[in-house]
Amino acid sequence: MLRKMGEAVARVARKVNETVESGSDTLDLADCKLVSFPICIYKVLRNVSDQIHLITLANNELKSLTSKFMTTFNQLRELRLEGNYLFRLPNEVSSLQHLRAIDLSRNQFQDFPEQLTTLPALETINLEENEIVDVPVEKLAAMPALRVINLRLNPLSADVRVIAPPLIKFDMLMSPEDTRAPPP
């Protein structure tokens, strides 16, 4: 077990070093078995955090992200968090004013993360395969850049299915009503 942990730590260190040394705008920490974002990464990336435009933390074991993560990487254009255990986002997600795409699919959201509706550049939201019942349709309709929101495989209420289509100017992807039964 210790050997596997050591290998995981070494993999994270290698990926972070590659980002710093290459001057890449991408930090890919997918499939690293992370339960939280490593604090030491803030220090290592302090001189290049403004240059990072894409972070992938997909398929880890994250339950939350800190406000420090959001404010440190406030130049992000894309954030990939699919396949974790997230159920909410910190309020500081509103500092991601340049964010164009966020993937929160296959997490544990029961409530739509309404902070996303304050992001002026956000074009794509993927919340597929969560537990979301209700969606702030009016707030989404007011988002200037939004083009697609994926809500497939969520137990959406009938109200969302009926009210949303006439109000929105973007593509709202939903599963057929009988794909998943709502929770009891």
UniProtKB/Swiss-Prot annotation:
LRR repeats, residue ranges: 23-44, 51-72, 75-96, 98-120, 121-141, 145-167
Keywords attached to this entry: Leucine-rich repeat, Phosphoprotein, Repeat
InterPro entries given in the database record: LRR_dom_sf, LRR_domain-containing
Top-level taxon of origin: Eukaryota
Record keyword Phosphoprotein present: yes
Keyword Kinase: no
Protein name, UniProt field: Leucine-rich repeat-containing protein 20
Modified residues (Phosphoserine): S175
